[in-house]
């Protein structure tokens, strides 16, 4: 009721810190079924917030939703397994970083660009531990930026359904 109606589109970017490949073993323990149990308070809070995000999305069954998180541990979580997932690479949307990123969406035909391959010329090489790519960016705001072309694509495909 605070919104003045229901949203047509929902975009969610839950905190990736405890799901990231770089910090996953600091925050999580792999269970027998593949789920990643929290072992830090930060990870437990991240799971609560992410699950609340999914609950809020469920309040609006007619909305198109997109949930974004860099490819990593979130895709292993039990609570996200029933959501359709796609993986994009930021370089295919004009960024100089490859940054494989998972997008969960109920859009019937999101038509995301195919992922590029490691070593392709469309992105800067960023081997683990290097100072290039996302890991070379100094602040969270810069590391979290979503390419404009990907945002424009999401707007376009959402408008096709909502209009």
Could you tell me what each predicted segment is?
Residues 1-163:
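Conserved active-site and SAM-binding loop architecture
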